[in-house]
């Protein structure tokens, strides 16, 4: 048995991280430029930020574009994404170690993260996923270690990347404080207050920007209700937002962006209330899209992508389910924060857009569970802390 701090563990971890780095560098060199519309837009926004210190996109959060502007679009931004993705390997090791206190399980987790095709792919395509996943993992590691201030900083930075985590983070502060670290109610209240202070301090510049841009307080951005309506309207047939029959012309006539945002929200709620059966059917379609083993987009439904996706994701999913069914019974309280995020993210994308791209942030948690199952099935029993 190897321990978490002995030389063999450190050597294995270093080798795994090196393999992950080499694979990401190879992908950066060999993978053709994908030119995702979002990636092209992020690069243009980074140039705009660098040249004029302006950010005029009402539908996106700014942190990834700010970091791209600071590193410079091109190979330096790519290198930074590769660094973040490689750091996520180390963070996954730390998360598994914090959960199970078993070095072998942590090493298997790190190895899976290092070679997992989706993490390699997203490390080199210029999207926000890599930054968001790295910050999310960092927040969870810090919470499990009891570093609430660092966890709060990582959480809010993840919200400034993508606002997905906004509603769940304060709930997790309470859960980790009361049930993982067994702090008193007074100490928990202090942790929540600390999170609130950090949230305000880090979000305040963005709020000032939004107030100058829109003349009113906008806490996150104006994209959520656009997506809500795009995902819930009579013309949406697939559960995505790329249906050819989508029509937003009635809203584009509204010049005020905040009023337009409210109109999107009201129209979506009206549609859901008037046809709840259709809403439920769409939610089912979105669930299927979200958990589908291979990509939905036509460009990525070639045999290579389909087989590669199935071979990588399906074993992880099956092993994660095996862990949850057969090995997690005495460990539920400790793993619940991961399960909560998996359920939370799934629920959001059953209401909003269903896409395997948006599933990526929960896949490190599936890998953690899968690694635990694999080690248990191999006969190395461990007792959860």
Stretches found by the model and what they are:
Residues 76-100, 115, 138, 318-325:
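Transmembrane-helix motifs of polytopic, lipid-linked glycan transferases
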